[in-house]
């Protein structure tokens, strides 16, 4: 079975711990994205799976076998590198054929396989060229072709689309997804681009400082972020995280002070478990309704900056106490700079994070 | 247009002329000519009749260029000097004798290429090691290796002579080749290490993941990428070794004498003063092998020297 499993994997470089106690399992046919800001340990995790870095602690299990002490060439994996890492002195065709030499595949079979993947990835016309003679998109596809030309245990992608322009990125995203769907292999994709992760992954593992903060489906990590970091990392524009002072909770409504304003907003019932004190309220910019009259369930703020984004408009508003709030409204809603807004958060989309930043949810 | 005619003649084929303009191109040509002048003078001297070598004013050209050059600057070219390199009479009335220069040319070519190639093989492997598997104190070792080139030859020659005499390497091919190899190694390791340092480590990682062992990564992936570096290192090493005089003078025997040593002896023997045309003929012949190697490797050489200075 083509699976990947990390069991309490830790990787240290000297005194620096790049990956801390990571547990992750990827089923056959599943695509898992490691997502996080730069330096969060996602690429190190990938290199540990590939065997390019040894683990300090824990176990790397690929296809049911512990691979800790096996060098990369014995792990039977395929990897696509951020900078493609095509062999500069070999033609594109030879590049794609390279992994097949080690599998002892005969010349005719080799040519057939190269031609097959070249056809899938539209590379037939560049097979005889050198890597520095083809376009960025073709390089990406050649690197991809080299990975899928044989039948490895699993696929690893390191920021596969980061070097492409926006348009090409969109089409490649689709292509990669399509190719991967037909292969039923465990796949790990490292990216710092949440859109890439949300669109390509079956599950997303969000990393920060070497730790996995949350693993879940794209829908889960967006709708039910496990903590304030995940909440702020996923979604554009960023979720509003407002410091609040929780007073009481009764009948599904929490009384609290947010930026100097006393509010009574409906929240998750689990908030009842919290002691009164400091919490963080998370509301996505699209989860506000602007109402004409303010009441105890609305936050009043003044529009400071307006950014039209096409179908929607992003408003940067500021409360009297100086808290910044991002609000997205539809294009038809005309708001002028300086206008007073009464913002009512959608109770189903209002997240409460406790003092440690952990989501409070039933 | 003048340019199109010149273009057809092969001028300006490089876009350099268009960019730099004719003025600058000509200025560079003049400087280049000044640099080449001594070499050209030696080559011409090799073709002059013996008496012409020291004429004042000198003869300058083998042809009058359709009357452009006055007759007293024109010499009558001859191949006689080249013949005398290999065979000439050693006494005023004696019959021509073989000079042994064929042997010396063979020695020069054999010793220089053997030692440079040997240094290239050992040095490239060592450089790869230094670059990819750094030891604790890597830079110190590299520095120590370079110190062998910091002393002038004259400083180390006496202990080397003594050591060679004790182990019986004096005058043997093995001895001189070993010595040159050792001297070329420092240079080779430093050169090749910088080439390996420039390579993208991702490419090697990719090859490992694709199933290559360390050896295969080196031979199939790394080595093809540093061909320019190998060529550059080879040529520079060859030029240094080819022209080396002092070690060759003191450590080669009659059978292993190299051309620079033999040249020295040809000049100072015979008691007739220096035979300048003969010397020029030897020098001209001596130029040819290194000139050819450099010429055939020059594309690699240029890429080798400018390696890493262009955006990857």
Regions found by a protein language model. Give the residues of each.
Chain A
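ABC ATPase nucleotide-binding domain
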Residues: 5, 25, 61, 342-344
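ABC ATPase nucleotide-binding domain helices that frame the ATP-binding cleft
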Residues: 43-46, 142
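Helix-to-loop junction immediately C-terminal to a conserved catalytic motif
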Residues: 50
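ABC ATPase nucleotide-binding domains
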Residues: 31, 72-229
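The feature captures the beta-strand-to-loop junction immediately N-terminal to the Walker
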Residues: 35-37
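Non-catalytic connector elements of ABC transporters
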Residues: 237-239, 248-362
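ATP-binding/catalytic-site motifs of ATP-hydrolyzing domains
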Residues: 59, 65, 211
